[in-house]
Regions:
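A general alpha-helix detector
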Residues: 9-10, 47-52, 86
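Short, well-structured N-terminal submotif of metal-dependent ribonuclease cores
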Residues: 1-41, 54-64, 140, 145-146, ...
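Acidic, PIN/NYN-like endoribonuclease modules and their adjacent C-terminal/linker elements
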Residues: 106, 112-159
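Alpha-helix/helix-capping structural signal
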Residues: 8-9, 44, 82, 123
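Active-site neighborhoods of divalent-metal-dependent phosphate/nucleic-acid chemistry enzymes
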Residues: 75-122, 156-158
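Helix-adjacent hinge/juxtasegments
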Residues: 51, 60-82
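Short glycine/serine- and small hydrophobic-enriched flexible loop segments
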Residues: 51-54, 110
Length: 159
């Protein structure tokens, strides 16, 4: 059992003004507690998240991001040459209109049997996993859980 975290979730976790910040905080908090098993992301998701943070929030936010990934206990899968080649082929074929990073995510999920996917892009990824969590997730929580998420969010995703 495991969950794969998409770029948008990790970006929203670090951008307190993002419309999905509370959902991202709740998803990551529950992922870290093992609700779906081990939380995974790929090295390409790390790169993509870092680029988004730099372009939208500046250098300080971008430079702070990779350290919390390891500190938080997220498992980062490094894209090797074979996975990169297969992802490039998927990207070139235009399968599901996936970007290169998204294609690597699909390949890792398939290879590892990851059944849950955290994303705010349900249109593109809604059928990629048995369990897709994202927008509105925080609304499904109890008041006590929402309070915990608010504390986690205020403490800040480590950055």
């Amino acid at each position: 059992m495991a969950i794969f975290l998409d770029t948008g979730v990790l970006y929203a976790l670090h951008d307190t003004a993002d419309v999905h910040h509370l959902d991202a905080s709740a998803i990551v908090l529950h992922a870290l507690r093992g609700k779906w098993g081990s939380p995974y992301l790929s090295s390409y998701v790390t790169v993509e998240t870092t680029l988004m943070l730099k372009s939208r929030l500046g250098w300080a936010a971008a430079r702070a991001f990779p350290n919390p990934v390891k500190e938080m206990g997220l498992k980062e899968l490094v894209v090797d040459e074979e996975t990169h080649g297969r992802a490039l082929a998927m990207f070139a074929e235009g399968r599901r209109e996936l970007g290169l990073t998204d294609a690597t995510s699909v390949l890792f999920m398939d290879a590892l049997g990851i059944g849950a996917f955290a994303t705010f892009d349900r249109r593109r990824f809604g059928r990629l996993a048995q369990d897709v969590v994202g927008e509105g997730y925080s609304k499904s929580l109890s008041d006590e859980e929402r309070d915990e998420v608010a504390r986690f969010s205020k403490a800040g995703a480590p950055s």
